[in-house]
Amino acid sequence: MTVSKQIKSKISKEGLLTISLDEVNVPDPDDGEVLIKVQATPINPSDLGLLVGPADVSSLKEVEKGSVVEMKVPDGLIRSVAARFDQNLPVGNEGAGIVESAGKGAEHL
């Protein structure tokens, strides 16, 4: 098992958006899978929508040095994100890197 870091975004029912850099356990690859060490990722508009949503970026404050920030979602916009209340969602779905390990049948990758 490998430990990695992942950016996550969560909005509370109270309208507080939290962006965190969390440590996550990454399992060893199964048959036919590879584990990639990500070295570069783009930030797409869809990533920004999930990352920041309708939060007021001028309200940004650091909560934990280097790993957590918070912003307020304006009252008039909070209903637009009700479906994601209290879900700590991973941000981003693209990346480039090198194969770190491979499962059975994927060694050639």
Please provide the spans of the model-predicted regions.
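Glycine-rich beta-strand-centered segment in the early N-terminal region that forms part
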Residues: 27-42, 55-109
